[in-house]
Amino acid sequence: MMSSTTIDVPAESSNVAKGKAVLVAAPRPGGWKKGIAIVDFVLRLGAVAAALGAATTMATADQTLPFFTQFFQFEASYDSFTTFQFFVITMALVGCYLVLSLPLSIVSIIRPHALGPKLFLIILDTVFLTLATASAASAAAVVYVAHNGNQDSNWLAICNQFGDFCAQTSGAVVSSLVAVVVFVLLIVMSALALGKH
């Protein structure tokens, strides 16, 4: 007679085949998200260089003509134009944001399926894209008038006299437009990664 506290378990013979468990889990689908996160990080590094390069180039744009009169000295500097001051400040802010967004981009590489960092980055990328586009467009308009003048308003082109100044400001505008294009790519890639979730 068996007591009520014991359980009878039949002994297995060594000849009975045992089922085998899978030790390695199947890879999660969506490994391409890690690739997008790596490209995102590299593009952010490029955008940092473009934005801070644009701000630095514009901030150092200064030229004084070698001739002057008794009362006037002819000088062109970025701080003579409020649009260029706005440009320097906003592109510096954009560059700082991009530097501060690099850790979140690294988190997206480590955890490619995490939604929080991607959503946060896409929202802030859109805000700073707007800021970068506004400053690049306004500076481009002033650079265009500096190169070509405006006959209707009797504004003369100043780039004939201030060639170095115009070259620096034009380079800064081109660099800022590169940053804008990179922002657009970042937003599209983030949207694709979020849309496939």
Swiss-Prot record:
Extracellular side: 56-85, 140-171
Subcellular location, principal: membrane
Biological-process GO terms, alphabetical: cell wall organization
Gene Ontology cellular component terms for the protein in this record: plasma membrane
Family: Belongs to the Casparian strip membrane proteins (CASP) family.
UniProt xrefs under NCBIfam families: A_tha_TIGR01569
Subunit-structure text: Homodimer and heterodimers.
Protein name: Casparian strip membrane protein 4
Organism of derivation: Lotus japonicus (Lotus corniculatus var. japonicus)
